[in-house]
Swiss-Prot record:
This is Holliday junction branch migration complex subunit RuvB. It comes from Acholeplasma laidlawii (strain PG-8A). PANTHER family: HOLLIDAY JUNCTION BRANCH MIGRATION COMPLEX SUBUNIT RUVB, PTHR42848. GO terms for cellular component: cytoplasm; Holliday junction resolvase complex. Its EC number is 3.6.4.-. One of its GO terms (biological process) is DNA repair. The keyword rRNA-binding does not apply. GO terms for molecular function: ATP binding; ATP hydrolysis activity; four-way junction DNA binding; four-way junction helicase activity. Residues 183-253 are annotated as: Small ATPAse domain (RuvB-S). Transmembrane segments: none annotated. The RuvA-RuvB-RuvC complex processes Holliday junction (HJ) DNA during genetic recombination and DNA repair, while the RuvA-RuvB complex plays an important role in the rescue of blocked DNA replication forks via replication fork reversal (RFR). RuvA specifically binds to HJ cruciform DNA, conferring on it an open structure. The RuvB hexamer acts as an ATP-dependent pump, pulling dsDNA into and through the RuvAB complex. RuvB forms 2 homohexamers on either side of HJ DNA bound by 1 or 2 RuvA tetramers; 4 subunits per hexamer contact DNA at a time. ATP binds at residues 21-22, 63, 66-68, 129-131, 172, 182, 219.
Length: 337
């Protein structure tokens, strides 16, 4: 994977800089206003009753702030948070160890919760409902079960694939929130905040340009800011101007719509190889040399949001907007194929 591509694609990587940029309270968190309002009410009510917060499920595209919100919830509750991910929980013992280590009121955050093995997931059910663990011990022909009492805790799950969660697991979350792409003005606020954290001056036209190319995603906005800052520090007096921003983003291969070479490869695959579609996910993935899961989680959410593609029962279809972007003549009725 190239350096340019990684700015937009490696959305699950986190580093110390990104941790430094994270807001610590709901008041500091920019965007997702409806979610913040509801969380504030739920948190205040839980604190007033001196109870643990109901379990929370956060879902949406990568980079929209699910992990940050989980940490903020713990901060607002004044409790500790333990962070893990679905792939790290391979067996029942892994989950039991995590749950047994919690103190009363603590938050357990599981990223990519849809990737927990189903047999492990089932152990969560009683833990979430009754704060108990029922463990079956097998000893040759005899088996017995033991019950472990757990302290009250809050489970926060995050996923990019809401539909992959089992119905029993979804039903055990008391609050479910879908994070949306951020509005342009919200991304601008995030860019201005980032410039203050890094103590880099940026002019307003540069803020606007960088924000427009950030795909409505805070993590991308912050990463693009750091790359543009590099150009500014080497080529000017470190002030981030419109010219420097345009130069840096062009070098990174990101166009004025926030699309990169991989997006164009995807769209050309549908339009040129499959006559605009419909095309199945596996066929498309094979054509462009990408994993199906990456296409679903990273490529498609933004292209769907912006109207370049549609998902139909028969597969992916390129829209007239995609044809116009690629400079290919569009014929009415293609979407009805």
């Amino acid at each position: 994977m190239s350096e340019e591509k990684s700015v937009l694609r490696d959305l699950n990587l986190k580093n110390d800089d990104e941790l430094m940029l994270r807001p610590q309270t709901l008041n500091q968190y920019i965007g997702q206003d409806d979610i913040k309002e509801m969380l504030s009410i739920y948190i205040q009510a839980a604190l007033k009753r001196e109870e643990s917060l109901d379990h929370v499920l956060l879902y949406g595209a990568p980079g929209l702030g699910k992990t940050t919100l989980a940490q903020i919830i713990a901060n607002e509750l004044g409790v500790d948070i333990k962070i893990t991910s679905g792939p790290a929980i391979e067996k029942t013992g892994d989950l039991v160890a995590l749950l047994s280590s919690l103190s009363p009121g603590d938050v357990l955050f599981i990223d990519e919760i849809h990737r927990i093995p189903r047999f492990v997931e089932e152990v969560l059910y009683s833990a979430m409902e009754d704060y108990t663990l029922d463990i079956v011990l097998d000893k040759e022909r005899d088996s017995r079960s033991i019950r472990i009492e757990l302290p009250p805790f809050t489970l926060i799950g995050a996923t990019t694939r809401f539909g992959d969660l089992s119905h029993p697991l979804r039903e055990r979350f008391g609050a479910v929130f879908r994070l949306s792409y951020y509005k342009l003005e919200e991304i601008k606020q995030i860019v201005r905040r980032t410039s203050k954290v890094y103590q880099n001056e940026i002019d307003e036209k540069a803020v606007d340009e960088l924000s427009k190319r950030s795909r409505g995603t805070p993590r991308i906005a912050n990463r693009l800011f750091r790359r543009v800052r590099d150009f500014a520090e080497i080529m000017t007096d470190a002030v981030i101007t419109l010219d420097i921003t345009q130069l840096a983003l062009t070098k990174l291969g990101i166009d004025h719509k926030g699309l990169d070479a991989s997006d164009y490869l995807y769209l050309r695959g549908i339009v040129e190889r499959f006559n605009g579609g419909p095309v199945g996910l596996e066929s498309l993935a094979s054509t462009i040399g990408e994993e199906p899961g990456t296409i679903e989680d990273v490529y498609e959410p933004y292209l769907l949001q912006e109207g370049y593609i549609k998902r139909t029962p028969r597969g992916r279809v390129a829209t007239e907007l995609a044809y116009n972007l690629l400079g290919v003549k569009y014929y009415k009725g293609l979407l009805d194929n």
